[in-house]
Amino acid sequence: MSHGTYYECEPRGGQQPLEFSGGRAGPGELGDMCEHEASIDLSAYIESGEEQLLSDLFAMKPTPEARSLKGPGTPSFPHYLPADPRPFAYPSHTFGPDRKALGPGIYSNPGSYDPRAVAVKEEPRGPEGNRGTGRGSYNPLQYQVAHCGQTAVHLPPTLAAPGQPLRVLKAPVAAAAPPCSPLLKAPSPAGPSHKGKKAVNKDSLEYRLRRERNNIAVRKSRDKAKRRIMETQQKVLEYMAENERLRSRVDQLTQELDTLRNLFRQIPEAASLIKGVGGCS
């Protein structure tokens, strides 16, 4: 996996060091900043289109001790795993009518990559393109409709009874078909038609006891209403008698006031006193 254009800091035997076109900075300017760096030629990766650029860029640089221990047959990158000698087996299935299978020749030679060999499915653009879909695409709605059967809804001809439930007529479905969506379930047998009153025999003891309890409750409610009416009438009579007493008391006080006024008018001193008091006020 090593590349021929990868150069290390320490030159090997029979290999010329890499020279830069610009002037080299003195030891006083940069010091030992670039002592342990490695340089990579990116032109080979850009032209050939290989996918090992990031792995080579971030590969760990071997230490001087590791380089001194390497033998003549040791690879340049000790941290890489050895390649698998077994050939790569490509799958034999295809990806649908709209896609082409990737043959083994695509990865046999990394330098001969042809982007036209891989067919990329393009999505339709615009509102008209969304109507047609590929035959190999999966549609969950079509799957539910295919397995749930046909369902028809019967609407009444007139809207006179808005509370009347709709009748759902469902076609028979095969026994091997999976259950459909819970939104399309058939109506349960305990519907409105089965909610009728239970037939009770009027001659039975239970019916008689129930009627007797109902009659007792009705009589109690009627007696309670009668007592409330009598209490209300009694309170009305009491309020009327109190009103009569108050009226008689008002008449009595009015007569006493008139008598006192007549007495003060017959005494002249009292009349002048009353006039003087009235003038001062």
Swiss-Prot record:
Places the protein is found: Nucleus
Cross-link (Glycyl lysine isopeptide (Lys-Gly) (interchain with G-Cter in SUMO2)): 121
Region (Disordered): 1-30
Region (Leucine-zipper): 246-267
An annotated GO cellular component: nucleus
All residue ranges annotated as the bZIP domain in the record: 204-267
Record region (Basic motif): 208-245
Residues in coiled coil: none
Alphabetical UniProt keywords: Activator, DNA-binding, Isopeptide bond, Nucleus, Phosphoprotein, Transcription, Transcription regulation, Ubl conjugation
Phosphoserine sites (modified residues): 181
BP terms from Gene Ontology: cellular response to lipopolysaccharide; DNA-templated transcription; granulocyte differentiation; macrophage differentiation; myeloid cell differentiation; phagocytosis; positive regulation of gene expression; positive regulation of transcription by RNA polymerase II
GO molecular function terms attached to this record: DNA binding; DNA-binding transcription activator activity, RNA polymerase II-specific; DNA-binding transcription factor activity, RNA polymerase II-specific; identical protein binding; protein-containing complex binding; RNA polymerase II cis-regulatory region sequence-specific DNA binding; sequence-specific double-stranded DNA binding
InterPro entries, per database record: bZIP, bZIP_sf, C/EBP, C/EBP_chordates
Top-level taxonomic group: Eukaryota
Self-association and partners: Binds DNA as a homodimer and as a heterodimer. Can form stable heterodimers with CEBPA, CEBPB and CEBPD. Interacts with GATA1 and SPI1. Interacts with SMARCD2.
Function of the molecule: Transcriptional activator. C/EBP are DNA-binding proteins that recognize two different motifs: the CCAAT homology common to many promoters and the enhanced core homology common to many enhancers. Required for the promyelocyte-myelocyte transition in myeloid differentiation.
Protein family (similarity comment): Belongs to the bZIP family. C/EBP subfamily.
Name this protein carries in UniProt: CCAAT/enhancer-binding protein epsilon
Organism: Rattus norvegicus (Rat)
